[in-house]
Each structure stands twice: as C-alpha cells, then as structure tokens.
Amino acid sequence: MLKVAIVGKPNVGKSTLFNRLIKNRIAIVDDTPGITRDRIFGDVEWLTKRFQIIDTGGLTTESDVFQRAIEQQVQFAIDEADIILFVCSYKEGINADDHYAAKLLKKHKNKKIIFVLNKIENQNKDQLNLSSYFSLGFGKPMIISAEHAIGIGDLLDEIIGLKDQFGNKKEQELVATFCIIGKPNVGKSSLLNQLLKKERVLVSDIPGTTRDAIDATFSYNKELYKVIDTAGIRRKGKIATRIEKFSVQRTQQAISRSKMILLMLDGSVDLSEQDEVIGGLCYEANLPTIIVVNKWDLVKKDDKTMELFKKQIRSKFKYLPWSPIIFISAKANLRIDTIFQTIKLIQAQLKIKISTSLLNDVVQKAHMINQPPIFNGNRLSITYTTQAQGQIPTFVLFCNNPDYLHFSYARYLENKIREAFGLSYVPITLYFKSKNARNRKLSKDVKFKQTGYDLE
C-alpha cells in the first residue's frame, strides 16, 4: 500500500490533517505543542483508491526530554513513506523549526515531497503573502485548512495522482486485529517494538510516554496482524490534564476497533486495583482477552511461582475466567511466540460452528441431569437452542419464560456448552427468549454474558 507521512514542526496542524484525511479522531489534537510523540498510522480512501497515512511528532531545534526519540520516529516515518507531506502553518508563520525540518527533508532526494501550507482559514488565496515560504526551497505550497476542510480534496487528488508511480502492492488479509492495554509502564510499547522488530514507539522509564493509540501492521510467520498500542490508563485521580483524558478515550476507542485484547500486567509487582479496573474494560467489551504477564524475567521463581501468580490473577479477575494467561518478557524477547500461539487457538474457537441438533442434544442432556431451580414462582423449561451469528459464540435458548431463569443455572449451561464444544478461551453469550408471543410481550429477554446476566 502507498505510504504517506506528515512531517513538520509542532503545532502546524499535522494531527488535525491526519484526522481529517482518515475521517476519524484518532490522533490527539490540542493547542499544546508536541502532543504527538509516536508515529500514528491510518488508512485513507479517495476515489476508490487507498493509501496509508502516517502522523508524526513535531521537529524542533529546542531541547526536550523526548525530542531525540521523536526525531528518530520521524526519521522512521520518512524512510518507510513513499510521499512526504511537509506541513507549515500560515497562522504562525515560519521560524527556525520550519527551516530545520526543511533541511532534514532535503537529505531525502529520492522522496516525493508535497509542500502544504495549513491554517488558511478565510483569507483570499490571491491576497496571501507567500514569499517567505519560498525560502524553504520546496516551491509554491498547496493551500489548505485541515480544520475547515479547505483544499483537502485537491490534496487528495495530488496524492492519488502520484500513486501509480509507486506501483500497486497486493494487500494481504489480516489474521487478527488486537489492542494492547494496561496501566502505564507495564511494557506495552516494549512489546509493540518487539512485535515490529524496531523502535516504532517511544520507550522510557517515565510512565505515560505513549499518549496516542498507535496502529501498526506487521507480519509474523508470513501472516499479517494489526496491533493497536494504547496509552496507559492511570487512576482517575491522576487524570489531571486534557491530554491524559484524551488518552483514556483513545484507549476505549482502540478497544472498540479491535477484535481481541491483550491485557498486560507487570509480573514484577503485586496486582493493583488499577489493574482490576482496566480488566473491567475487557469484560465490558465482551472481546476475547489474553492476560499477558510481562517482566517475568525480573521475578525470583521456583516451580510454584507461576501457578501462585495465576491463582492471584484468577482471584482478582473473576469476571474473566475464560481468559488464557501467558508469561513473557517483552524487553528480553522471551516467550513472545506464545502470544501468537494463543491468538491462533482463540481464532479457531471463534470459528466453531455447531449444528443445531448437536447443540440441542447437549443442552437437553444438561437440562435433564440438572433441573433448573424454582425461581420467581416457577421452573425454567428450555425447548430449543440454536447458535446465532456474532463476533463471539452466541446462543439463543427458547424457553417457557426468561423470568424464571436464575443466573446460577445460566452459568451451569454456559459451562456445559464450553466443555462440550471446546470453547475454553473465548467469551460466549446466551440469550434466553420466550418461545411464545404472549410471554414475549409480558417478559424481557435475558442476556447472560460470562459471569453475570443483564436484562435486555
């Protein structure tokens, strides 16, 4: 796929342009310079043609604790991109940072560079004073306002017009899309860099280095995956700034865009209430979740350590009893392959389709062996069960009246279905519906999800 990188100094509107092009608010946008630190990837479609857009951190001559790493990330983006959008701001004018970015880009004579002048709001284009911008050495800029969508169509036409120069690369089908979530500094970015085999994300001992949710595609054993790394979720009392609040929202959005979750824990410290809260997001999302215990190389171990830690996890995450638990060290590159082995196991279980006759045999047998308790004045009677379409295994059980269902019996049936059909690593959902129209009007269907049930 054609790759286009957005490059420029801080606060020229790179992230606003990125969000405008992908028609979604993924990159954090704020008036504070330097908000974007990592590369952020998104897909753009224009006139039935697609390309990948890369947002980058701002280039500046000023010293910053992260500036050297940010510049490294920008360099990675330039290296992998086919086209560079060099963005300047008409509102702020040019300064030493613009010249610094221009000097860096001029070193890449093999790259196609489109000079873009942003933040042209309501000015008449014919009255613009562009003389100072010619000093950057890239000719006349394309005039846009990313915030107000002015000139965006012309910019997209220019990019698509260059697409044929770079050939058409066949797009490989994704095996899985998953996000990595966890509290700050558990090693999410270190794992992502291990998966990608390069320093794609800033890694630091300072908690909260990653602010955006960062999409990346990579190949493992010749199969294509998409991973979404996220900012660490802090305790509510520590979400002090707008930027941190945006990061929490990005994490929630990353989960909504994923098909699977890697919940990362720090194995070198005790589990915290914060870990439990983040685990609750996995439960609410109702997505397959792999609990990944990181930094296992730092733990003093004997033959019982792993099992004891698993028991602690099961005690803290009672609402995720089906989630597999694996132990890795992202920094030391230990047992990373177990992530993909587990993903493949989960994918296989998600694809299981059960014949209606076999499913009814299992449910009716379970029903006969263990009769439902009397609840709300009567006993539940199940007459028919079928598998419904869904992202996770979903089953509809027709009964005399869902009001007679006790949650313990729903859990019993869930466990029987899991045992019979090998659904040990995925969430499943049971819908209890009345078999006749009259009861359907008088009662509510019951949705049983994992370890509890909600009235629909």
UniProtKB/Swiss-Prot annotation:
Residues 2-167, 176-351 form the EngA-type G domain. Keywords: GTP-binding, Nucleotide-binding, Repeat, Ribosome biogenesis. The gene is der. GTP 1 binds at residues 8-15, 55-59, 118-121. GO terms for molecular function: GTP binding; ribosome binding. It comes from Mycoplasmoides gallisepticum (strain R(low / passage 15 / clone 2)). InterPro entries: G_ENGA (IPR031166), GTP-bd (IPR006073), GTPase_Der (IPR016484), KH_dom-like (IPR032859), KH_dom-like_a/b (IPR015946), P-loop_NTPase (IPR027417), Small_GTP-bd (IPR005225). Belongs to the TRAFAC class TrmE-Era-EngA-EngB-Septin-like GTPase superfamily. EngA (Der) GTPase family. Residues 352-436 form the KH-like domain. The keyword Nucleotidyltransferase does not apply. PANTHER family: GTPASE DER. This is GTPase Der.
